[in-house]
């Protein structure tokens, strides 16, 4: 969804790397907590990294509503910069299936499926699921500081030569996220046009790479999280 958002006037997006990298959304100069993200009117502050806008596939949304300045009352009053509301597909056909899969560089896999059915008695159910995976083992150009181990076991830090720029390959930077949204309810009833009960589950796995200018080196560090 992030690629679709940046085409809107006043919208800017900054990412710090490959798939699963940190993202900062700017709306007319406002960013961070001043711009609120919603999915079908539900705030996503505690939904976890799997529901970051740069991880959600574009098939997931029917449309994207962007409010600048004046924000509708249902989104609260603390969004000084504005609101981005992702409205998901609400299929009304008897049966539907939408699926996609893509493969890219650095062992990047992205997949999405949206499946559901509406019965004649008004009972309806729907399942949305998507996942993103990438090794993020691309090359970068930067100067590298070599450490020297002395005979006594101590480490010598030689002067940094910033003219010695090398092409190095990133490692320990794998990212993987999964999300499942299930809904069940009724439609077209005298007492309700649409009444749904849903659940959401997501998880992410993010490896942390040692920085190219880092003096204290750590290995195989990662972050992971789950939401339900």
What are these language model-derived features?
Residues 7, 34, 42-69:
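Short acidic/polar hinge/loop motifs at secondary-structure boundaries
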Residues 2-43:
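Extracytoplasmic beta-strand/coil segments of soluble accessory domains associated
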Residues 19, 76, 104-107, 168-177, ...:
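Short sequence motifs at beta-strands and strand-loop junctions characteristic
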Residues 28, 67, 87, 114-118, ...:
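Transmembrane beta-barrel domains of outer membrane proteins
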Residues 23, 82, 95, 109-113, ...:
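Hydrophobic, lipid-facing positions within transmembrane beta-strands of outer-membrane proteins
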Residues 93, 102, 118-216:
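Periplasmic-side early beta-strands and strand-to-turn transitions of outer-membrane beta-barrels
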Residues 58-100:
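A beta-strand signature from Gram-negative outer-membrane beta-barrel systems
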């Amino acid at each position: 969804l992030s690629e679709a958002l940046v085409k809107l006037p006043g919208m800017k997006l900054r990412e710090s790397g490959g798939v699963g990298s940190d993202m900062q959304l700017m709306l007319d100069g406002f960013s961070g907590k001043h711009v609120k993200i919603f999915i079908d009117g539900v705030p996503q502050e505690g939904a976890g990294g799997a529901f970051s806008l740069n991880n959600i596939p574009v098939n997931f949304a029917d449309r994207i509503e962007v409010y600048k300045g004046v924000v509708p009352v249902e989104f609260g009053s603390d969004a000084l910069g504005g609101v981005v509301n992702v409205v998901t597909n609400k299929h009304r056909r008897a049966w539907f299936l939408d699926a996609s899969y893509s493969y890219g560089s650095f062992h990047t896999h992205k997949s999405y499926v949206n499946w559901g059915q509406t019965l004649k008695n008004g009972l309806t159910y729907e399942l949305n699921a998507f996942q993103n995976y990438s090794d993020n083992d691309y090359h970068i150009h930067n100067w590298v500081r070599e450490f020297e181990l002395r005979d006594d076991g101590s480490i010598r830090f030689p002067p940094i030569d910033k003219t010695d720029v090398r092409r190095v390959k990133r490692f320990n930077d794998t990212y993987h996220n999964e999300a499942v949204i299930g809904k069940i309810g009724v439609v077209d009833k005298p007492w309700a046009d649409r009444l749904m009960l849903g659940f959401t589950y997501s998880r992410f796995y993010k490896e942390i790479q040692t920085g190219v200018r880092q003096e204290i080196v750590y290995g195989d560090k990662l972050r992971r999280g789950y939401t339900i």
